[in-house]
Amino acid sequence: MIAIYPGSFDPITLGHLDIIERGDRLFEKVIVAVLCNPSKSPIFSLEKRVAQIRRCTQHLPNVEVASFTGLTTDYARQRNAGVLLRGLRVLSDFEKELQMAHTNKTLWDNIETVFLATSNEYSFLSSSVVKEIAKFGGSVDHLVPDNVAEDLYQWYKVHPPQVSPPTIMPTPQPFIEG
């Protein structure tokens, strides 16, 4: 079965990549469908986002990256995909995604939505959070693939923070009178 994982991916995060990698194991093919949404103002062009995702998914044999405009259900029908893959971080995501799944079902009866709970380490992560951290010069190296982190630092004209390893202090020894 073919699954579509739609989104704006501006930028792709390690949370997105986690869903893609898990989808790769579950489905015959996963199409990461990068949405061209005229109502959004992405920092990266559509072509740049597609290239970023292709670079960080090249190790996944069943993943294809493409862009689309219009309704996700129309795109799924064109690509013979029967599943929309969605990640859920928190309860509010579920409410929004469930409503969207019902709406998509009214648009095309043959589409199903499969929800994957995000891994714990990514439950707080969103593209908006990543952009905010990068904008103010914080490190996003642990939140996005390396190529995307470099692109973010260039976009915001900040230098990647130099993170030094933590200082290990010797454990104090108890004072023993002798």
UniProtKB/Swiss-Prot annotation:
It catalyses: (R)-4'-phosphopantetheine + ATP + H(+) = 3'-dephospho-CoA + diphosphate. It holds the Pfam family CTP_transf_like. Its cofactor is Mg(2+). The keyword Membrane does not apply. It is found in: Cytoplasm. The keyword Nucleotidyltransferase applies. Coiled coil: none annotated. Pathway: Cofactor biosynthesis; coenzyme A biosynthesis; CoA from (R)-pantothenate: step 4/5. Its EC number is 2.7.7.3. Its main location: cytoplasm. Keywords: ATP-binding, Coenzyme A biosynthesis, Cytoplasm, Magnesium, Nucleotide-binding, Nucleotidyltransferase, Transferase. GO terms for molecular function: ATP binding; pantetheine-phosphate adenylyltransferase activity. GO terms for cellular component: cytoplasm. One of its GO terms (biological process) is coenzyme A biosynthetic process. Homohexamer. Reversibly transfers an adenylyl group from ATP to 4'-phosphopantetheine, yielding dephospho-CoA (dPCoA) and pyrophosphate. Belongs to the bacterial CoaD family. This is Phosphopantetheine adenylyltransferase. It comes from Picosynechococcus sp. (strain ATCC 27264 / PCC 7002 / PR-6).
